[in-house]
């Protein structure tokens, strides 16, 4: 019994450590204006980038063969755009290739493995926030996969829920101003 309690305590300590490590020790590569790695790193969310320096983020659009897109709703505790709709995405970790980052983010946030999905990289756009230290490239991917409700396992720290929407429904949501990045990525939703 004592050993079991000790193992349980160790398990919870490791879980707490992993959450802390992922939050506070995650590192990102710094890129130049040509999207080349500089060889330097930054801590996650340490917005100290100089003008001309960027980090890399990825977005993974999932479309079913019936033409519907998977979108998720951001949790209300997000500091930026709480409750807004979005597609899966996030930052590439140091040393991680863009394709690996998008596969990881989609799997973490939705439980869906897009490794065997049709599609892939579509385009990149650049977002600059002069003087704020948060400049980034966004690699946008589109995957076509037959996803069913039972395939989805939402990461509750990130999303309130999800839904599948048509192009028209997506445009209606975007018209409310509550779809993250829509103006930058709307071309990926077209045929």
Where in the sequence are the language-model features?
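Short, Lys/Arg-enriched N-terminal segments with co-localized hydrophobic residues
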Residues: 3-4, 8-24
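Nudix hydrolase/Nudix homology domain
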Residues: 21-23, 78, 82-83, 94, ...
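Acidic, metal-coordinating catalytic segment for phosphate/diphosphate chemistry
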Residues: 24-59, 65
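A residue-level structural signature of the nucleotidyltransferase/glycosyltransferase Rossmann-like core
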Residues: 28, 53, 68-69, 84, ...
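A glycine-rich, hydrophobic loop/mini-helix early in the fold
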Residues: 57-89
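The catalytic Nudix box helix
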Residues: 70-71, 87-120
């Amino acid at each position: 019994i004592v050993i079991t309690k000790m193992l349980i305590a160790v398990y919870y300590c490791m879980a707490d450590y992993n959450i802390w490590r992922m939050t506070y020790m995650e590192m990102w590569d710094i890129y130049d204006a040509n999207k080349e790695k500089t060889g330097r790193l930054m801590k996650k969310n340490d917005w100290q980038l100089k003008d001309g320096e960027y980090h890399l983020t990825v977005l993974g659009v999932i479309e079913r063969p019936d033409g519907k897109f998977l979108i998720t709703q951001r949790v209300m505790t997000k500091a930026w755009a709480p409750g807004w709709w979005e597609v899966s995405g996030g930052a590439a970790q140091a040393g991680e290739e863009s394709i690996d980052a998008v596969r990881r983010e989609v799997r973490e946030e939705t439980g869906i493995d897009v490794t065997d999905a049709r599609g892939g990289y579509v385009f990149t756009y650049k977002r600059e926030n002069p003087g704020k230290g948060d400049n980034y490239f966004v690699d946008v991917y589109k995957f076509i996969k037959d996803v069913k409700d039972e395939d989805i396992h939402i990461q509750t720290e990130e999303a309130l829920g999800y839904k599948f929407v048509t192009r028209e429904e997506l445009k209606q949501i975007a018209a409310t101003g509550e779809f993250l990045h829509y103006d930058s990525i709307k071309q990926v939703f077209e045929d």
